[in-house]
Amino acid sequence: MARGKFITFEGIDGAGKTTHLSWFRERLEQKVASTGRSVVMTREPGGTPLGEQIREIVLHQKMDLETEALLMFALRRQHLAEVIEPALARGDWVLSDRFTDATFAYQGGGRGLPRDKLETLERWVQGGFQPDLTVLFDLAPEIANERRSAARDPDRFESESVAFFNRTRAEYLRRAEEAPYRFAIIDSAQSIVQIQRKLEELIAIL
């Protein structure tokens, strides 16, 4: 069986990516049902037993910026070794709620960690490995902030300022501009129906 495909969903908090991920998974499962492949859904930070434990620390405990970035990449290495790479080798499809682009956007763009440090970690942890498709849900931080305000217990990223998310969004868009061959940008200000129509178009060409 041919190697599977790796698809990531990205966007600032409040952009709606997680809401649409489950719907996308259902449609993708319908597409691959006759091929004997499975669809694996995962997330970052997290995705493994170790990752889920440390996820709570990363999301809720204040820490040094470089420690934060190192933890993200350490968890990613385990995620790749334990979940992503084995699934792709089996021929399965993997959907991940965030991956490396989030680290460049949040720790790089948002927090200001130098890009060269992140690129060094990326090369060490991933080699040349990248997603086959990254769906970026793009939304103005002011609108995303209104959506996030409904969250009952926001984590320390969700609690960041609009200025932080402006920087994060800008870095996401920079990443997309540098790798247009794997990015699909969706305007999250659209209606759910319009967004799902765009996602259907992506599934059709996978």
Swiss-Prot record:
Transferase is among the record's keywords: yes
InterPro entries for the chain: P-loop_NTPase, Thymidylate_kin-like_dom, Thymidylate_kinase
Gene Ontology, cellular component aspect: cytosol
Residues given in the record as ATP binding sites: G11, I12, D13, G14, A15, G16, K17, T18
Gene Ontology biological process: dTDP biosynthetic process; dTTP biosynthetic process; dUDP biosynthetic process
Gene that produces this protein: tmk
Pfam families assigned: Thymidylate_kin (PF02223)
Name of the protein in question: Thymidylate kinase
Role description: Phosphorylation of dTMP to form dTDP in both de novo and salvage pathways of dTTP synthesis.
